[in-house]
Amino acid sequence: MSGTKVPESVLVVIHTPDLKVLLLERADHPGFWQSVTGSKDRVDEPLGETCRREVFEETGIDTARHELTDWQLQNRYEIYPHWRHRYPDGVTHNVEHVFGLRVPEALEVTMAPREHLACEWLPWERAAERCFSWSNAE
């Protein structure tokens, strides 16, 4: 049986003006750190709406109060075979759209406990080194 997950997602890099970046440690893969990511809930969901929903769900940060920017970057990557059952039959790749969310300072974060174990604000160079996903590190 095939799944219904939409193979289109967002990656939202949350950062301060001095380029401290928020990273989240994944609960399902301890030791793997990333920015906020998430798939569209439906094919016609606007990407900005996906960003707002995912950022709020994963951090408690309201994007409406800050500067959300579409960086006009996309990553196309192969979906791991063990996750393909979540998608319609025949889907093997996902397209990820990259956004930035500029916040005035390192904000307090309310993590989604089922999704993340820890969070940390790091200078962008250290954040890039720590990221699990190659698309996060770029």
Please give the residue ranges for each predicted region.
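Conserved N-terminal beta-strand and adjoining loop/helix that marks the start
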Residues: 1-21, 43
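Short, intrinsically disordered, charge-balanced linker/junction segments flanking boundaries
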Residues: 14, 135-138
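Residue-level signal for short, function-critical loop segments
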Residues: 27, 39
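A conserved beta-turn-beta hairpin within the catalytic core of GNAT-like acetyltransferases
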Residues: 29-32
